[in-house]
Amino acid sequence: MSSKLPKKSEENLELPTFPASEESLSRSEKLKYVFVRNPFIPLGCLMTVGTFLASGYYIRRENHLMANKFMRYRVMSQGFTLAALAFSVLFIGPPRREAPSNSSGSINSEIKK
């Protein structure tokens, strides 16, 4: 009974590296990097904004029960966002940066300058 599933390897779990100079990236590339690195943080932000807007809608319609319910959902979505942020910091770690290119190939030459 052979399994057709690919074997997990550390190569598949590699996170993208952030370039040494952030000025070389466009906004869309930075946003793509954030979504790839931890998609739950932007998702939590969108959930928070959505529930906040929905509660505002129900406040204007004077449906205070639904407005209160969506305010509770907003607090839960903020908690989800903070949990995703904490998970990112604790388990994924800080973003890895590419090493700056050194023309001489030696660290000591940079120290002497």
Swiss-Prot record:
GO BP of this protein: mitochondrial cytochrome c oxidase assembly; mitochondrial respirasome assembly
Places the protein is found: Mitochondrion membrane
Topology in membrane: Multi-pass membrane protein
Region (Disordered): 1-27
Principal cellular location given in the protein's record: mitochondrion
PANTHER family assigned to the protein according to its UniProt record, in alphabetical order: HIG1 DOMAIN FAMILY MEMBER 1A, HYPOXIA-INDUCBILE GENE 1 HIG1 -RELATED
Originating organism: Schizosaccharomyces pombe (strain 972 / ATCC 24843)
UniProt keyword annotations, A-Z: Membrane, Mitochondrion, Transmembrane, Transmembrane helix
InterPro entries to which the protein is assigned, alphabetical: Hypoxia_induced_domain (IPR007667), RCF1 (IPR050355)
Segments passing through the bilayer: 39-59, 75-95
Coiled-coil portions: none
Cellular component terms (Gene Ontology): mitochondrial inner membrane; mitochondrion
Ranges for domain HIG1: 12-103
Name of this protein: HIG1 domain-containing protein C25B8.07c, mitochondrial
